[in-house]
Amino acid sequence: MIYKNVEFSAIVTKRKNYRERDMLVTMFTDKYGFKTFFVRGVRKRGFKLGAAILPFTHGTYIGSINSEGLSFITATKGIDQFQSINQDIILNAYATYILELVKAAFEDSIDVTNTLWFEKVLKALSLINDGFDAQIIANIIEVQLLGKFGVQPNWRSCVICGETQSQFDYSESYGGILCRKHWYMDKNRLNLDQRTMYYLRKFSIVDLNYLNSIKVNADTKKKLKLTLNEIYDNQVGIYVKARSFIDKMTKVENNLLKKD
């Protein structure tokens, strides 16, 4: 099915050359999920949509959406670009990671929650672009996206007794947190410190629209990263390309800190 002359909001995620003068541009749209657009004549003099199809550009687009094949853009109505993300390799990597994770969760499906997730991702990228800690914003998305992968940990209360005020640890076997008196039930629980647990629980409910500031020390950031990597590896079972780059950059940074 083709939806002609529709207006939609979108974020440009990537593009690649196609033939001599054309491009294939992938966008995350608010209504149609991730779609690939065929853009003709990109290299022709006077091409008017050049700025609109740069990576990490977002705005309102008009075009035809094909439910199965390539879609098409005919015009735009106001666009903006995440310049800091484009200019910083680390910010770029985390923004790409967020988009790749969301794409893995949604693919080309039209989901009733797609618009909500589009707005959430747009806000996440805006925060990263404005100077918020890119890893922490990505961690928040990781935690909140787990449900879309069929993994819905209970972060609110102990999965055994419902306790909400205690020391907690995360259990992959039980699919959520265990209070201290039930730690004995899972010898393979993650043995997380309470500061890491606090942030994981907080991340599961935080609304990015009301996030004014967030500061997490380096040690806790490292533990959050390792914990979420383990959950995604063991329970979700996906590994997106951008994470590999982030892991390498983190390793280089840690080695430099050791030398200092």
From Swiss-Prot:
Signal peptide: none annotated. Keywords: DNA damage, DNA recombination, DNA repair. One of its GO terms (cellular component) is bacterial nucleoid. Transmembrane segments: none annotated. The keyword DNA repair applies. GO terms for biological process: DNA recombination; double-strand break repair. Belongs to the RecO family. Involved in DNA repair and RecF pathway recombination. This is DNA repair protein RecO. It comes from Ligilactobacillus salivarius (strain UCC118) (Lactobacillus salivarius). The lineage of its organism: Bacteria, Bacillati, Bacillota, Bacilli, Lactobacillales.
